[in-house]
Swiss-Prot record:
Role played: Ligand for members of the frizzled family of seven transmembrane receptors. Probable developmental protein. May be a signaling molecule which affects the development of discrete regions of tissues. Is likely to signal over only few cell diameters. Together with CAV1 may promote chemoresistance of gastric cancer cells to DNA-damaging anthracycline drugs through the activation of the canonical Wnt receptor signaling pathway.
Keyword presence, Isomerase: no
Main location: secreted
Record-given protein name: Protein Wnt-6
Annotated compartments: Secreted, Extracellular space, Extracellular matrix
Post-translational changes noted in the entry: Palmitoleoylation is required for efficient binding to frizzled receptors. Depalmitoleoylation leads to Wnt signaling pathway inhibition.
Signal peptide coordinates: 1-24
Length: 365
């Protein structure tokens, strides 16, 4: 018998991020991770369904999905670097976080699903996957020029040289459809949502919100063609947003996440506060309050904040007052190595010396 859907989703994320040590929920983000599609797929077959088919037929796609999931966790660590829970994933505690329906878990599922879609789409455009390539020409007209070559802008007047006849889709557009399809196939469970399975509904919604953060923020890039710098013809294509931008937008959604509960039949979600409007497709959802993450707690997966570096003069989340949960902080002088005396050598290398510098750090008690 298959494990419950939420368990399969969490297990799959663990498989993607640490295939060689999934049995112990061993996490090694921050150290070199060797991608082994065979190892992932040997474990993933326990999940059954189309994931196993993808493993057998397209292991190179699975490798990109895993790369994208790790990209998502690194982005989570960047966006949460000043928070009490900083997306640390070096221990079993991360697995316990994934088993809760809290805001932080919503962000993790969204950013890893987004990373999977982003990585596969990028691999297609780079010619690294044989199953896909550039985006097919679109049916709608590309944007009109704004007077600055190479930049999209408002439509030109009818019958002018800037009319639609001079503009067409071309280049190598990023095929987000293919990336979404593979992310959805492997990151989402194919089985029907169980009755009363609110966690599955929440996690699947957050996965889709992550992919939407990639798709809805693709940008149009154009290039002019013509003699002497003229723009006799202009080709345009769709380009993925930088993943840092995807992470920033999902962080905004994290701050405005909606708490939900299930309907009586367990097949849909409603706002926990009935007076609020239902959440949209791009919103992140959660069903339980987060712990305060101040002290270590094996049950919740909280690592605590003792020993974390903080900013003694900042009033925000990175400040010692908030990050240290009122316990206070101590000063410590440490010696670090940094790049210094960097010089550019033609062509095209930047060479630096390594210098030792002493810095004063504030650390939570």
């Amino acid at each position: 018998m298959l494990p419950p859907l939420p368990s399969r989703l969490g297990l799959l994320l663990l498989l993607l991020l640490c295939p060689a040590h999934v049995g112990g929920l061993w996490w090694a983000v921050g150290s070199p991770l060797v991608m082994d599609p065979t190892s992932i797929c040997r474990k993933a077959r326990r999940l059954a369904g189309r994931q196993a088919e993808l493993c057998q037929a397209e292991p190179e796609v699975v490798a990109e999905l895993a790369r994208g999931a790790r990209l998502g966790v690194r982005e989570c660590q960047f966006q949460f670097r000043f928070r009490r829970w900083n997306c640390s994933s070096h221990s079993k505690a991360f697995g316990r976080i994934l088993q809760q329906d809290i805001r932080e878990t919503a962000f993790v599922f969204a950013i890893t699903a987004a990373g999977a879609s982003h990585a596969v789409t990028q691999a297609c455009s780079m010619g690294e996957l044989l199953q896909c390539g550039c985006q097919a020409p679109r049916g709608r007209a590309p944007p009109r020029p704004s007077g600055l070559p190479g930049t999209p802008g408002p439509p030109g007047p009818a019958g002018s040289p800037e009319g639609s006849a001079a503009w067409e889709w071309g280049g190598c557009g990023d095929d987000v459809d293919f990336g979404d399809e593979k992310s959805r196939l492997f990151m989402d469970a194919r089985h029907k949502r169980g009755r009363g399975d609110i966690r599955a509904l929440v996690q699947l919604h957050n996965n889709e919100a992550g992919r939407l953060a990639v798709r809805s923020h693709t940008r149009t890039e154009c290039k002019c063609h013509g003699l002497s710098g003229s723009c006799a013809l202009r080709t345009c294509w769709q380009k993925l947003p930088p993943f840092r931008e995807v992470g920033a937008r999902l962080l905004e959604r994290f701050h405005g996440a909606s708490r939900v509960m299930g309907t009586n039949d367990g097949k849909a979600l409603l706002p926990a506060v009935r007076t609020l409007k239902p959440p949209g497709r791009a919103d992140l959802l959660y069903a339980a309050d987060s712990p305060d993450f101040c002290a270590p707690n094996r049950r919740t997966g909280s690592p605590g904040t003792r020993g974390r570096a903080c900013n003694s003069s900042a009033p925000d989340l990175s400040g010692c007052d908030l990050l240290c949960c009122g316990r206070g902080h101590r000063q410590e002088s440490v010696q670090l190595e940094e790049n210094c005396l960097c010089r550019f050598h033609w062509c095209c290398v930047v060479q630096c010396h390594r210098c030792r510098v002493r810095k004063e750090l504030s650390l939570c008690l």
